[in-house]
Curated annotation (Swiss-Prot):
Entries under InterPro entries matching the protein: Bact_response_regulator, CheY-like_superfamily, Sig_transdc_resp-reg_receiver
Keyword GTP-binding recorded: no
Protein name in UniProt: Polar-differentiation response regulator DivK
Main localization category: cytoplasm
Native source species: Brucella anthropi (strain ATCC 49188 / DSM 6882 / CCUG 24695 / JCM 21032 / LMG 3331 / NBRC 15819 / NCTC 12168 / Alc 37) (Ochrobactrum anthropi)
Cross-referenced Pfam families: Response_reg (PF00072)
Amino acid sequence: MPKSVMIVEDNELNMKLFRDLIEASGYETIRTRNGLEALDLAREHRPDLILMDIQLPEVSGLEVTKWLKDDDELRHIPVIAVTAFAMKGDEERIRQGGCEAYISKPISVPRFIETIKSYLGDA
């Protein structure tokens, strides 16, 4: 069974790019634009990795990450923050919020794929 990545991203173009890159690398994707749905989807699908946009309309991606990490059944799933925040201190704040890794937008495609594979291995 292929490994899966849940993408939590409200921007349609970013969602399509991330989905295309991840699926082209041989992984399955579960997608939502709504941070409030992320917890239920994670429980239902048990993804191997979660890509989390930090700036979501309903609730911050860091808040969603906190909920995931507070859940005994989901806390083991690595969360990679994908965000336009690129100021000094942002990466540290994001890692302290529970994210295992951080990718800044606009993404570097090779680095994006390399980061995904570092958590999932080859598909």
